[in-house]
Amino acid sequence: MGGGAAEFYGPSDNTTFNMKGKRSDSRNLLQEWKDIQTEMNRKHVLLHTNDEFKRTDWSSVDYVLGLFAPSHLAYQLENEDQPSLAEMTEAAIKVLSRNPKGFLLLVEGGRIDHAHHVNQAQYALTETLELEKAVEKALSLVDQQETLLLVTADHSHSYGVVGYPTRDTSVLDVDNTAKVSVNSVSFLII
């Protein structure tokens, strides 16, 4: 579950998001996935909207493919109509935990990195908290004696406190002791 629906459609496909697919081979992988699930008589669901997500009875499906945006999911601060990372984690565990052999689930807070790349500290911090909520949700749903949960980063970006901000300055603001740097460019505290 996540974003990236455009990568599953060909350029001429009629898509849920009114966008052109990006597949150069013109395959509609979502239709192929649905056809395979139907052919194998599997209980499955393909989701594109938060309403579909919220209406899904997770105990009645064994296979889930949820693509809620043409590209990346929205940052949580801007998210009005997509499931949260914690909600998707919960749904995945509800489906996967019925397997008597156990399961492996990968959950990524990918928007943390995107926010760092464009110097959006508030977005990066909020996305980190969203990942924490997903971890907390996972821990609440599994037998912790039987579960190995790893939290790691594929790479990281460090935070540094820059300048000499006064105590009452938000770390998400510009340095209030010198609103511009030597070369007249404003800089964020973190």
Protein language model features and the residues they cover:
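A post-motif C-terminal structural segment
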Residues: 1-190
